[in-house]
């Protein structure tokens, strides 16, 4: 067997994509991988379900609702799904990969003082909504508190908001959990 084919087959086996190595639950599937890319929210149940035997997309969403799985940025600028119990150590371990991103966030005016204020507003909001809030609800709360989440440049609409949410994920304040209307709600990390 040629080396590239062996490598490909080894990856398929290691990722739990064959019955012999498939996980028993969504939590096991994600923990076996440490982290699973999750940019496209609608594809997450299928990506996890493909690594489990007989698991429906609804069962994957139940794992998020129970707080077993979270969606966040534990490393670089790519959204990943991790287990809730692995999220914080992964986030801390991979913190060194944030330098370039932090420079860009600072250029958006995201000072430590602003981030701390935004974190407090988010935590206050989540105290009254422990099941989670949508991005729109969080951004609205920030607006009521005088925190501007809009960039001046029309070519960068949403970039400041994204950077602020991402910073609070990377700092371990927020993460995304249960799904409502196709959106992962923001919850207390």
Task: Give names to the regions the model predicted.
Residues 60-61, 162-166:
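Short, hydrophobic-biased segments on the C-terminal half of alpha helices
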Residues 81-87, 180-189:
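Short, cationic-aromatic polyanion-contact patches
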Residues 163-165, 176, 183-186:
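Short beta-strand-centered interaction patches in the first periplasmic/extracellular domains
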Residues 169-171:
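Extended, solvent-exposed regulatory segments
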Residues 1-151, 157:
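Phosphate-backbone binding and catalysis cores of DNA-processing enzymes
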Residues 152-153, 162:
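Functionally engaged cysteine thiol sites
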Residues 73, 177-178:
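Beta-hairpin "wing" of winged helix-turn-helix
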